[in-house]
């Protein structure tokens, strides 16, 4: 379900990545693969796009992406810090320079005490650079998910535009002996 607006955003993002030798990864929950689909709909996406993890279930956020289990227990899966840890985890797990993550409630029912339209998008990049945005989106389930994709692409592009040129093409982790970003990565 691509729209001209997000399709153009994905193409522009990938052109910048290709020009600068940057790789990307995606972690998705509420968007369920839509963000990765937008990116891979662009011809040549494989030059920059490492892959995606669709961690729809809460235990996958912990076990695959390394989101802290106590954070999930205390705040639930729909939380800004969860989104940040998802982005950092997929960046580490897939060996990308930059990553973006989505989590939230598309509706029609509330989840984890959050109303439909509550969405968090986060980016993670080199040297600990990250940002999380809290969104209150309106519309149908499809409209909320599509808007979240657009917001994620916009946030990631803004960070890539602002990144120092010397950071291009740096793989994570900067130190290959570095531990996973969160202690729960790989715990069962």
Where are the model-predicted features located?
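Short alpha-helical segments enriched in small residues
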Residues: 1-188
